[in-house]
């Protein structure tokens, strides 16, 4: 869950007002015994694990979680599980010193596991710090555990992360137990890293470039899905976590520089300005709501094709507009957004990694209906019109090559190569 800061984010609080939210740590905090001792001395909580003798159900749950932890990417889990078993066995004697030692040993193991589990996804662009995994300090982890009505259920809930993560991890672990090969596939760990930032609860949009599918989620359940067209191998759709606050009807399309250079300018040279005008293009002086339009006759199109002249070209709303009738923007540094398209034939293709990074959606009206709560009808007629959503909706663009099909784990082709190394983005698209 996003907590209080996340709730404020979804109600549309400006990004500037979010700056006070603390950034989560970006690397695993190596917890020492001193950290745990300091926690117990500072907060003086009731025992978490040994409140009325050893909490056998919680200890068994913790041991099982730690034994499975290599499949979360935490290789130290089995070693910590053995330490927990030994400490709990000694505490069952009722010896006060053994009980105190067990309490600290179990807390140390749990904190180390949670801190490893709640790392930000490598290579993901977080539009707001609050979208990163939260609650990784010793005090946050242990106070939350101490306050849980059922410690056993709390441990399971934290370890399961979210429904997508849980299904992938548990399927892989069950298959490993069946075969006896307990070494997790690096591809699995890469995929788990890419989905660990998804929320366990609430409403969000998931765009998966691995399968080129968009899924709508509510409290971990899939409500709807549709095909999308995502980035090519050369121009992949980035990993992004953001929040969508509005949609745009009848959007202008701003042509990327490389398409101006490779497509628009050469076509003007060979076909003349009639090509330019028939496609609804304008050369403008700036990216703004009211730019000045520049006469295309004054442009050196050969220089534009050569890349020595950089033009700002937009396409007016209409049937030829590359954005279709709806655009779904959200804050991010890569200028990525979702949008409609007039070309629906490509959705029939099996391989839909065909875009320049942005995401074309199969049914923009259906997505708009889910976001708005009613049929998307522009209040501004055919003019470009922005409509605010009643509440911000989190959106996650990720890349999932591990799939569970008929109860078995399978892998899709790694077209981006991100199963081997996290993404490094180009400075421009």
Residue spans for each PLM region:
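Well-ordered beta-sheet/strand-loop patches within structured domains
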Residues: 18-30, 108-112, 116, 131, ...
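Gram-negative bacterial Sec-dependent N-terminal signal peptides
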Residues: 1-17
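Cationic-aromatic interfacial patches
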Residues: 18-128
């Amino acid at each position: 869950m996003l907590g209080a800061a996340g709730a404020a984010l979804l109600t549309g609080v400006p990004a500037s007002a979010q700056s006070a939210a603390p950034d989560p740590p970006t690397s695993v905090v190596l917890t020492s015994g001193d950290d745990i001792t300091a926690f117990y001395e500072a907060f003086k909580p009731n025992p978490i694990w040994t409140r009325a003798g050893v909490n056998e159900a919680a200890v068994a749950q913790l041991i099982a979680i730690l034994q499975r932890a290599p499949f979360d990417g935490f290789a130290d889990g089995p070693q910590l599980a053995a330490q927990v078993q030994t400490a709990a066995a000694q505490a069952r004697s009722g010896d006060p010193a053994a009980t105190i030692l067990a309490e600290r040993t179990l807390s140390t193991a749990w904190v180390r596991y949670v801190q490893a589990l709640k790392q930000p996804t490598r290579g993901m662009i977080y539009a707001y710090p609050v979208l990163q995994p939260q609650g990784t300090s010793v005090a946050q982890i242990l106070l939350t555990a101490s306050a849980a009505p059922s410690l056993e259920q709390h441990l399971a809930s934290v370890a399961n992360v979210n429904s997508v993560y849980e299904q992938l991890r548990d399927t892989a672990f069950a298959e490993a137990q069946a075969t006896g090969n307990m070494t997790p596939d690096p591809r699995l760990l890469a995929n788990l890293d890419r989905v660990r930032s998804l929320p366990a609860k609430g409403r969000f949009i998931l765009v998966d470039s691995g399968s080129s599918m968009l899924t709508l989620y509510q409290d971990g359940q899939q409500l709807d899905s549709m095909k999308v067209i995502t980035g090519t191998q050369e121009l992949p759709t980035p990993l992004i976590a953001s929040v969508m606050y509005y949609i745009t009807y009848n959007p202008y399309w701003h042509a990327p520089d490389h398409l101006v250079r490779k497509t628009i300018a050469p076509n003007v040279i060979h076909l003349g300005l009639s090509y330019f005008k028939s496609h609804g293009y304008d050369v403008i002086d700036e990216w703004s709501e009211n730019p000045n339009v520049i006469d295309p006759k004054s442009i050196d199109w050969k220089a534009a094709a050569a890349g020595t002249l950089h033009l700002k070209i937009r396409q007016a709303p209409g049937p030829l507009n590359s954005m279709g009738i709806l655009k779904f923007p959200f804050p991010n540094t890569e200028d990525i957004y979702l949008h409609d398209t007039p070309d629906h034939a490509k959705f029939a293709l099996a391989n839909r990694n065909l875009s320049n990074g942005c995401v074309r959606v199969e049914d923009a009206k259906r997505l708009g209906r889910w976001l708005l709560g009613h049929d998307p009808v522009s209040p501004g007629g055919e003019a470009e019109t922005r409509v605010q959503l009643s509440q911000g909706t989190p959106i996650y663009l990720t890349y999932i090559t591990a799939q569970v099909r008929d109860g078995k784990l399978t892998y899709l082709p790694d077209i981006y190569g991100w199963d081997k190394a996290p993404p490094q983005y180009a400075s421009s698209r």
